[in-house]
Amino acid sequence: MTLLADPNDLRILGAYSARMAAGDTDAVYDTFAPDFKSHVTARVRPGAEPGDIRPHEATWWASARAAFPDMKFRVNLLVHKDDLVVSNWTLQGTHTGAPFFGVAPSGRPVEINGTAILRMRGGKVVEHWGGPHCSEGIGLGGARFDAA
């Protein structure tokens, strides 16, 4: 099994991560194909209809930025095989902003770790599986938090 990364895919995902960490939700439109399919979005974001779901992805990131104004997002690991990239990531911040998934700001630091499996085609993400590993960090317990 070859675990060598396609430099272009890794560059694209690295730029996406940096832009999202900076609050640039337009990165969703530049990185994800219009027919991007998330195996997570419809389940955790009621109202996300089939079709272009990039607006739902951008809204999720905007709500995370509003809840965690000091948000930092980093990619810990990227593994590439054929057209798939596996990413392990960490989102850190302090919940001092807006409510997040209905949870009022706690003022506490939060660290959310997750894993994403992304299918790449033509320099765009076309399919996604995965999400956060847990949601206890902000008191959500068993709440539906499997967002992309």
Model feature map: region roles:
Residues 1-148:
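C-terminal and inter-domain tail/linker signature
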